[in-house]
Amino acid sequence: MKEAEKIEELLGRGVDKIYPSRELLEETLLSGKKLKLYQGFDPTGDKLHIGHMVGLRKHRQWQDLGHEVIFLIGDGTGEAGDPTGKKKTRERFFTSEELRENAKDYLAQARKIVRFDGPNPIKIMYNGDWLNKLTKTDILNIAEHFSVQQLIERDMFQERLKKRESINLREFLYPLLQAYDSVHMEVDLELGGSDQTFNMLAGRTLLKAMKYKEKFVMTTPLLSDSKGIKIGKSEGNVIALTDEPNDLFGKIMSL
């Protein structure tokens, strides 16, 4: 397959949206420029599921095209607790130690799909390495680029307000922490599920404000079950990559 055909497949298959535009990203790739990109994974469980497969397959495509790909373990963001899609505040928040322990299983499972060694290996990083070192001044400098109105506009927060459910300040600030990942690593592109669009665009805003650098965002479609509910840990309909082959087949066929 020719390089142009590989780029066409990368941008056209298993992709929901590209920001600011597919045309600009395609032009950049056809110019021969190699990008630095990442996807973050908060290991709030110990199993990757088929919903992660779409992103991991994209990782492999970017990797095979010679780009610098980072598999980011969100042990720092995971402590804050991503509120995306959650109708209530979590009953408990994870510690950095718990998240790093879960990450071992994530990496073992991801190795079956992407390469962490050999030619152009995917890099493994932990955002706790820099988020845990942020000072008060650092956090204030990040926060000044966002408004409460911007953050509170999110669908799940609006739904909570209507139902008089609490919004924990810890999870409220989550997008700012994820946004800082892009700044610290100075990436060219962030990859993630379409439900992460708000968080990823926050990173685009912050990177432009703090480093004067533009970042592409590529979102992948979410997998849903037969009821149209997103497959995920919180929804309780996970189909884990570690399931026995027969169980895995049966669960997939029931979607």
Residue map of PLM features:
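Non-catalytic terminal extensions that flank enzyme cores
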Residues: 1-43, 229, 236, 246
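N-terminal catalytic cores of NTP/NDP-binding nucleotidyl/phosphoryl-transfer enzymes
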Residues: 21-83, 191-197, 203
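Short, hydrophobic/aliphatic alpha-helical segments
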Residues: 32-40, 69, 174-184, 243
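Active-site rim/loop-helix segments in enzyme catalytic domains that contact anionic ligands
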Residues: 60, 67, 71-110
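Catalytic beta-strand/loop signature of glycosyltransferases that borders the donor
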Residues: 74, 218-221
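Short, hinge-like loop/turn segments at secondary-structure boundaries
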Residues: 86-92, 141-143, 234-235
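Divalent-metal (Mg2+/Mn2+/Ca2+)-assisted nucleotide/phosphate chemistry catalytic cores
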Residues: 93-219
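Catalytic adenosine-cofactor/nucleotide-binding cores of aminoacyl-tRNA synthetases and other
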Residues: 144-147, 221-255
